[in-house]
Amino acid sequence: MACTSNLSSLSKSWAVLDVPRGAPKATGLWLKRQFIFKTSRICMCMPTPTATQPIATPLIRDNESLLKYLRQPSVLPHEVDDSRKELLGRTRRQLRSTSEPLKAMNLIDTLQRLGLAYHFEDDMNAILSQLSSSGQSDGDLLTTALRFRLLRHNGHKIVQKFMDKNGKFKDSLKEDTMGLLSLYEASHLAANGEDILLEAMELTEAHLKQSLPSLPTQLARKVSSALELPRHRRMARLEARRYIQEYSEEIGHDPNLLELAKLDYNKVQSLHQMELTEISRWWKQLGLVDKLTFARDRPLECFLWTVGILPEPKYSNCRIELAKTIAILLVIDDIFDTHGTIDELVLFTNAIRRWDLEAMEGLPEYMRICYMALYNTTNEICYKILKENGWSVLPYLKATWIDMIEGFMLEASWYNNGQEPNMEEYVANGVTTAGAYMAMVHLFFLIGQGVTEENVKLLMKPYPKLFSCSGRILRLWDDLGTAKEEQERGDLASSIQLFMRENNITCDEEGRKRILQLIDNLWKDLNWELVSRDAMPLAIIKAAFNMARSSQVVYQHEEESYFSSVDNYVESLFFTPIIN
């Protein structure tokens, strides 16, 4: 289905809305799925609020409050959009007229970081294709590493030399902080087997940490930010918000480009508010949480993740439909996690396997309501895809839901029978119950680019490695972000505890360190999927990467509560515009 949006008719609004922070706390099965939006200890890598970047506190969690807020948009002034279009034209001319490779690469890099690259995809691809076909770069370390990172990030097959003729990194590189930083960022796109890049990662990290205390303030800030979270692992829209502030402080920045980035950010924010309005109205009409009062009422947080996975404005419809599936998934997760008896869960699982309305007859009333919501929503998505592209996709979407419900049921049976899975069993099943496969299969058809008979066959079990790598990163980061709170509640057996038991590790810090190493290895596997580009369209590859990025950004730290973290992201992305 073509996922497009009409930006010219959008509006923007912002306000402060104070809503109580209460939210249900998950208890029940000791094998917590904790999908995406459960209470957990995580925090966000957000820019520090400034005078030009006011941060309010919306605390909008329940759908009724969100709907009330979204009824008060103000119209985006036409003169603002006219100015944005003029700046877009000026930037396009600048990009096309830049003949020097380094200047072109720096401009592309800046456009990507400012969240503007989607406007110039054709022009940028032409430049990158020319760079790719021109062979090895003879420039300095900064230029060479930048070229490699841009080409690989955009799906070009590229092997780059970073060594001298003796196969060693030059000692002189240690004094080139910007070059080391560029190489450090590039090294995070390394795949398994690319030993030179992996060695470069260790070398540059060590030298950057060593030099950090003596660096000028602005450069030290850049280095600290990269060491905390490399750019390859950041959420695009959040990086745009952060980098707009950083770019404004850079000496010699392009004021026209900065102005364009601010206007465009606010424009996309207006689009997100319109999308939220549609999702919130749908959720209210669905009425699930009115009947299932134990279930989570968080369409806003569901939408936050879709923006992380699909940041480009053209995927507006995709975000809306994916947010619907996530919202229903959370309700089903709560049924398995906090409410359903084992006998009821068996009935529900069998009904999902049948996938017909008669299957509801033996279910409790609350399960019938949820079953009907899932059945109708999935069929409606299938109808939209059929109408748009002529594809009959119900067998594929239905199969992913069945797989996920069976995964929930497996966890319930482990608990009910007093069984403990091994690490691999837990993680493999946890990818399914985290919704990773469900989300990626839905997106494959919703995006609708590059769909072939060959790659459609890959959407059934066993799922593509692209999906499983991204899903495993999600699963492990989820456990890292929630483990301490789960222990405080008396929950058991996350991947961390299972790994520690299997490897005779008694120190929690060491266990977490080893899980982080597993995640790093999964990123190398994921990077290989970008290098190999077998059968999957680039848009789906990028979505899988973005799912992994979103999970790392969300669950990376433990100092803040989950809701505090989500509040920061939601406020920044959806409700607070960038003002001059």
UniProtKB/Swiss-Prot annotation:
Sorted keywords for this record are: Chloroplast, Magnesium, Metal-binding, Plastid, Transit peptide
Q: What InterPro entries does the database record attribute to this sequence?
A: Isoprenoid_synthase_dom_sf (IPR008949), Terpene_cyclase-like_1_C (IPR034741), Terpene_cyclase_plant_C1 (IPR044814), Terpene_synth_N (IPR001906), Terpene_synth_N_sf (IPR036965), Terpene_synthase-like (IPR050148), Terpene_synthase_metal-bd (IPR005630), Terpenoid_cyclase/PrenylTrfase (IPR008930)
Binding-site list for Mg(2+) 2 = D333, D337
Q: Where is the transit peptide?
A: 1-44
**Which amino acid positions bind Mg(2+) 3, per UniProt?**
D478, T482, E486
**Location (main, coarse):** plastid
Q: Could you give a single Gene Ontology term from the biological process aspect?
A: diterpenoid biosynthetic process
Residue numbers covered by motif DDXXD motif? 333-337
Q: In which pathway does it act?
A: Secondary metabolite biosynthesis; terpenoid biosynthesis
Q: What are its cofactors?
A: Mg(2+); Mn(2+)
Q: In which tissues is it expressed?
A: Confined to flowers.
- A Pfam family matched in the record: Terpene_synth_C
Q: Which GO terms describe its molecular function?
A: magnesium ion binding; terpene synthase activity
Query: In the record's cofactor note, how is the cofactor described as bound?
Result: Binds 3 Mg(2+) or Mn(2+) ions per subunit.
Recorded hits in CDD domains, A to Z, give:
Terpene_cyclase_plant_C1 (cd00684)
Similarity comment: Belongs to the terpene synthase family. Tpsg subfamily.
Quaternary organization:
Monomer.
Q: What name does UniProt use for this protein?
A: Putative monoterpene synthase 8
State the gene name recorded for this protein.
Answer: TPS8
